[in-house]
Each structure stands twice: as C-alpha cells, then as structure tokens.
Regions:
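Short beta-strand/loop motif that positions the catalytic acidic residue
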Residues: 236, 242-244
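Acidic catalytic loop of the alpha/beta-hydrolase fold
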Residues: 246-251
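Primarily recognizes the serine-hydrolase "nucleophile elbow" in alpha/beta-hydrolase
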Residues: 171-235
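C-terminal motif of bacterial Sec signal peptides marking the signal peptidase cleavage site
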Residues: 15-18
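Bacterial N-terminal signal peptides that target proteins for export
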Residues: 1-8
Length: 333
C-alpha cells in the first residue's frame, strides 16, 4: 500500500474513532467533538461594544456591529438553478464604493444555519473590500426562503441532511448571482465554518464553477468515504487553507495526514492548528463565560481565561491570514 493510501486510511480511522458517522447514527459528525457549550451556540448577552474593527465580530459583539455598519446589505432570493422554482435566501453585503470591479466571497454558515453572527462575518469580509454573500443553504429544506433565524436544533437537523451535491449546487448558484452584479469581478472564493468548513473542502474538491479561486475552511475537514481521501484531494486544483483549534480533537487528529497528503500531491495548501483554541474560536473569541461544572468537566476561572486568550490569539492570527489568502488568490492588491 502506498504511503498516501496509508495516510488516507489513518485519517479515516481517526475520524471514525472521534465521531459517529452519519450512516451509523443520526447524529452529525460536527457535534460529537465539540465542547459542551458549542454543540448549540450558548445564549450570549449582547454587548453595545463592537469589538476590534479589524476582526469579525464575536457572538457577543455581533448585534452592535450589524446595527452600526456603514456598508449596504440586503436579503436576496437566488434560484437554485435556471428555471428552478426553489430559491436560496442569502444576505449580500457590498463594500464601500470603489472604481474597480470587486471579487466575491461566499460565506458558508455553521451547522447552526445562517445566523446573525455569520452575517457579521460577511460584513467584515465586505469591510476588507469584497462583495460578501452568505447563503442559507437549507432554504429548500425549511420550506422556502426566509429571513427568520432558525433555532440551533432545527438548523442542525436540516444542515446534516443536506447532500454534498446540493451544497455545491447552492454555492455555485450564489456565486454566479453575486458575480453577475454590476460592481462584481468574475472571480470568487469560499470561506466556511464547521459544517461550512467541510462544505468549503467539498466545493474545492468538486472544482466549483467558473471563476472559483480558492477556499478557507475554519475547523472543517473533507467528507469522504473511508479510503477515498487521497483520490478526493487529488482532484483539487485551487488553493485551500485549513484553520482549527487544538481543543478540536477530531480535526487535530486528521490534520497531520491531510498536511502530508496535500504536500505529497503538490497542492497549494496551508494548515494551522492553534494551541488552546476551541472549535468555533472565531465566534467565541474572548467573550466571557462561566466555568463549566458537570460530571465530566470541572473548569476553573483560570481555565476559562486561558481558553479565551487562546481563542482571541487564534482569531488575531487566522483572520489576517484569511484576508491575505483572499486578496492573493482573488487578485486584489
């Protein structure tokens, strides 16, 4: 057996050991490895502070950031494909006026659906000079386009039942719509979080649609059949980056094999696993929370403070890397 196939098998075994696979249980692969407080986004008291303007908002600062943004944003409905009666609801944000045509960035939501926080990320992407569009990829499954935010439980059930092929179709439709806008350039990238990170990988493996220029996956790995990882990664033609936190055990176990396989395949890839950061570090950042006290968890305030610091450090390194990646691969100076 080749070294690459051994690596692929090792990754598959690690993933199976850390998470239940969908065909064995209804639970999705993204919840089994999360910290207890991240399985559903905890109720966060909103702050009137907007946070660091050079970073996306945290969960706590999202409302203030969205309320005070100087950028134009609106809800749009996009057909899944030409002639389709089904539409995708999406939130599109435009950068402040520019004389140049602007590339597009598709922002793919977590398993929690198109939340206010994802809209906040899209706003920050637009602040960096791109047209940002965040689709609600479960629009069809929820009964049609809606501006209402789903509950975390409802969103999780819908996202985990959406096939990869439909995700790719939805992203392609959204990208084509955004690139058709008068101010848009015919190039796009994808960034995604958790479930959206996996979706970003699969869109990259699938090849995207005309104009696809690369993807950034935050704490998400490829979803492939056991033993098929190497063949899937071999299909990649565009740059991709993976950013995760060391407390995300499943992705941490998979990353060394992905790194080695992508290097051996001579693909443009960068991966970083931030020490002490959690799954969902970009949403959490340094938002305050109480120590968790359960039968299996006995946190101290010092533990919480260390985690908050690690999450913020990961965000301060990971977001500039993301912006640099987008500008380089979308041809923005």
């Amino acid at each position: 057996m080749s070294t690459l196939r051994i690596l692929a098998a090792s990754i598959a075994i690690a993933s199976l050991a850390a998470c239940q696979r969908q065909k064995l249980a209804p639970a999705d692969e993204h919840t089994a490895h999360m910290a207890p407080g991240d399985v559903a986004p905890p109720a966060v008291a909103q702050s009137n502070q907007q946070g660091d303007p050079s970073l996306p908002p945290s969960a706590r600062s999202t409302a203030a950031r969205l309320a005070d943004t100087p950028r134009h944003a609106e809800w749009v409905k996009v057909a899944w494909e030409p002639g389709s009666k089904d539409s995708i609801m999406a939130w599109i944000v435009y950068p402040k006026t520019s004389n140049a045509k602007t590339p597009v960035v598709v922002v793919v939501h977590e398993i929690f659906g198109l939340s206010p926080w994802i809209r906040g990320v899209a706003d920050q992407v637009a602040a960096e000079g791109f047209i940002a569009i965040a689709p609600d990829l479960v629009s069809k499954l929820r009964g049609g386009p809606s501006m209402d935010t789903l509950s975390a439980d409802s969103a999780r059930k819908l996202t985990t039942s959406l096939p990869i092929a439909d995700r790719n179709l939805g992203i392609a439709a959204i990208a084509k719509y955004a690139m058709s806008q008068p101010s848009a350039a015919p190039r796009y990238a994808v960034i995604g979080y958790c479930w959206g990170g996996t979706t970003t990988w699969m869109h990259t493996i699938n090849g995207g649609t005309n104009g696809y220029s690369g993807g950034v996956a935050f704490y998400g790995t490829p979803q492939t059949a056991q033993g098929a990882l190497r063949d899937s990664l071999a299909k990649i033609k565009m740059p991709i980056m993976l950013l995760s936190g060391s407390k995300d055990a499943r992705i941490g176990a998979a990353m060394p094999g992905i790194d080695s396989a992508m290097k051996a395949l001579n693909k443009w890839y960068f991966g970083k696993n931030y020490e002490g950061a959690i799954h969902g570090f970009l949403r959490a950042q340094d938002d305050p929370r109480a120590p968790r006290q359960t039968a299996n968890v006995n946190e101290t305030q010092a533990d919480v403070d260390a985690e908050r610091a690690a999450n913020l450090a990961a965000t301060k390194d990971g977001w500039p890397r993301t912006v640099e990646f987008l500008k380089k691969n979308l041809g923005v100076k």
